[in-house]
Amino acid sequence: MKHHDQVADAFGSTAAAYLTSQTHATGADLQTLAESIAATPDAKVLDMGCGAGHASFAVAPHAKEVVAYNIAPQMLATVDGAAKDRGLTNIRTQQGAAETLPFEDDSFDWIISRMSAHHWHDVPLALAEVRRVLKPGGKVLFIDIAGADHPLLDTHIQAVELLRDGSHIRDYRADEWIALFDAAGFKASIRERWRIEIEFSSWVARMRTPEPRVVAIRSLWSNSPDEVRQYFDVKEDGSFKLDALMIAAQ
């Protein structure tokens, strides 16, 4: 199975769980997205890797149109249903990959993405597409899990992420994001950094992680160096904290 198909399969079967996930449905970053879009009258917004639609739902009341874009058709069906339930008539869905955006040049005032890019097969190509479909003077806000600055910490969190979700590619560090945006012709900065508390049981259940992999994650945490356990604040039940960041670019 190719990676794009793997992502679509993994998240198509878990769409309902992501809609009700408190980790995804809440957060101060959603308010930041909404306030940012509200500053641009009649904005047309692209939400890349929209997941169950929480970022789209947050910005839709402040936008002229929101295109919720995802590789998994079942995710998009979930977004359609939830948008209808919320009375958000200016959201439309579109299926596709981040690396091949099916839109005309200079189409969007804002391009946003929340907790998606760590699954993208080719981030440089995706950012080139973002540059192409963004209007002159348009803006970008990306939110994602961040890789750790120290190699010891980074190796462990990438391993944990991959064990939990075989479609995971990489949680990029802040400096990597700046370099990626710079290479795509953007001027980017880290707008915010924070930590997310991960409740282990619901985290693996949401992704339907097979039990042998759950056991492997627990073993990795329990056998990791003290520095790793302390940094990620690993609890006895396997719960821990992840780094997150918001990148602003234009």
Please place each PLM-identified region on the residue numbering.
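Conserved class I S-adenosyl-L-methionine
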Residues: 1-40, 54-58, 74-78, 82, 141-163, ...
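Class I SAM-dependent methyltransferase SAM/SAH-binding core
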Residues: 46-48, 52-100
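A short acidic, Gly/Pro-enriched loop at the edge of an enzyme's catalytic core
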Residues: 99-110
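A short SAM/SAH-binding and catalytic strip from SAM-dependent methyltransferases
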Residues: 109-122
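A short glycine-rich, Lys/Arg-flanked "PGG" loop and its adjoining helix->strand segment in the class I
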Residues: 124-136
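Short alpha-helix
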Residues: 170-184
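Conserved Class I S-adenosyl-L-methionine
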Residues: 187-250
